[in-house]
Amino acid sequence: LFATVLAISASTSALPAIANPISNPISSQISTSSIPAKNIGISGSNQFTQRSLNLAKQIPTDVIGLVMMDLEPKSWQMLDTSQATDPVTAIDKLLTSFGQLPQISIVKDIQPWLGKEVLIAFFSNTDNKFEFTFTALSTISDDKKFEFFLKKLKSLDLPKPIETLYQNVKILEWQLEEDSVGDKKPVLSHKLNSRNSLQSLLRLKQNTPTNTKDNEEDSDPEEIEPTTPIFLNFSIKRFAIAKLPSGIAVISTNRQMIQKMIDTSAEMPEQRLPSLADNPLFLRSLNNPLWNRSLIAGYGDFKELGKISELLAADLPETSEIPGFSRKEYIESLQYTLSQYSSFDLFTWVTPKGLRSQSNSYFSEVRSPIPKDSATRDRLLSYLPSNVYGAITSRNLNRQWQWFVEESKQQSTYKILVEGVRMLVPLMIGAGFDLDIEKDIISWIDGEYAVVVFPSDRSPFQETGIDLTIGALIRTSKPEVANATLAKLTKQLSKLSGDFIQVKKRQIGATVLTSFEFPDTRESGKTQSIFAYGWRDRQTLMLTLGANTASAFIPIPKPALAESEMFRDAISDMPQPNFGYFYLNVNVIAKQVATLGFLLFASNSDIPPSQDKSSQPVLPDEIKKVIDRLGGAVFVYSETSDRFQSDLFFGLKP
């Protein structure tokens, strides 16, 4: 965020889609979206699309990506009906909560002149391919307060700014670190709090005595802590700030980027650089009605992202025994993936029931439509219990696996997944066991499948205080193949475990289960089930941790997950068809985490005498109020002929 960047700078420092034959060029896919900027129709009261376009006119077209945030408090008020939410104030509180005490106050020094929107953009550095250029823009609501802010910025304990006049625009630049001379190498941080960070630089500037140079000369090189590069260092070496002729404030880690932005508004057409507002790919995203509804919207260019592939692979070794983990293999795989797509966008908005987000990765060329699947969908949702921690549902694992196998021939990074799965059986059961995981297991999972984590007082882990258990349902058109595999696995496990694990038959309702059981230490002669499987119907296989937990699925649970209001709210406007749901009951999970955290905290603190230490702790009202607002969250993937789409819903109660 613009305000955050200014405060920190001055004071303290997409999943590939299932491949389909390619037919139509990208031009046909964006022809209806590449409407000239002047013809964009604006809907909605806040005109976020138009305000975004005004800032985009200052952005050079070679941007890697950008994020646009609406700072209008009334746009956020649906998140909290009791009062208008101010996102800038929230950011200031967030920094304070992390112990940041900046010399520049976001609320006092920046918010008074900050406009109603902020844009953050990322560029590759043309002078150094191992660096990003980070730039933020915002309209100026009060020129005098902006000038006062610049005056205060100059008064800080920072190197004296360099003033440059470019096309009659004054640019102030602070050089915080010396640029490296010679070959440009990827900048790697040696530890989390790098001495190269701006925060450390300021601390050293304030605390280092005047004879530091002499001390450094006398220091023993062997006493210097050896460090190993771990991750890329995005520390700020310099930053520049200016007010563009359009009245927009800009801060950037590269002065030349500000100059390019000035050139996008040059009076002479022959001197004017093309801006993002002229880019048809960006206009396609901007014309999406979701942009105008969004609190946060984003756009990115895969072609520009590919230019920094060497930066992304900077820490990888030249050679590796692990497939796909050498620098060359990684870059080749990354470039192949990026070539399949043209651009991406992101939208996040508020609904009466919670937060919604959507991300689209557009194919480089329009693909043939996915063959229509007439099979019944989401049947298993009616067989799952409603009281769950989380659930994953999808369909046709066999087809998904075949796609991964084909992609691994083009992308070496997928080889580790494919080969890893193929090695599972030898690693878990032994190399002498005759079982092909692809032919004997994956091949018959050709229908819907679901995995669910849920609470149960019959969990096999109940005696340890854990009520969590796991169950799975699998629809298949090849039950005979599944039975042959299950019989083979049962025989092998019985052989390996000797007399410790016993295989018994259990019955839950009308379903007969094969149960794997071990001696119950609590009662002599009894056994306890750890895993069970059986056929819920002729084509639905059920697997559970513990035979008794199967009662959650048999007979049809009432209410089922499909009937849960929280789940229905989460999936109500998700695209259909899709690849399945990844669902979390955030409310229940948050209660469990908070209770566990309170127990851990209470065990190390003084508990009031009136509270019974052996009883279940009562959460503070403030925490309960926050948790009670939480609902369910669901993540969904889908695909059309022109894009791969992901959707997210996060439930929030009023």
Show which residues each predicted segment covers.
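Gram-negative bacterial Sec-dependent N-terminal signal peptides
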Residues: L1-I18
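Structural boundary/hinge residues at secondary-structure and domain interfaces
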Residues: S13-S180, A297-G300, E304, R356-P460
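Leucine-rich, highly hydrophobic segment in Treponema pallidum outer-membrane-associated proteins
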Residues: I18-R51, L55-Q58, E216-A266, S275-R395, ...
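Short linear motifs at secondary-structure transitions and domain/linker junctions
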Residues: N39-S45, K93-G99, K108-L114, K145-K151, ...
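Charged/polar, solvent-exposed surface patches and flexible loops
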Residues: K57, Q77-T81, K93-T96, P112-W113, ...
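Single conserved position on a long alpha-helix in the C-terminal lobe of the eukaryotic protein kinase
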Residues: V67, I110-P280, I442-D569
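Short secondary-structure boundary/capping segments
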Residues: S82-D86, S265-P269, L312-P317, Y362-S364, ...
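Hydrophilic extracytoplasmic domains
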Residues: S374, P385, I392-E448, F454-E463, ...
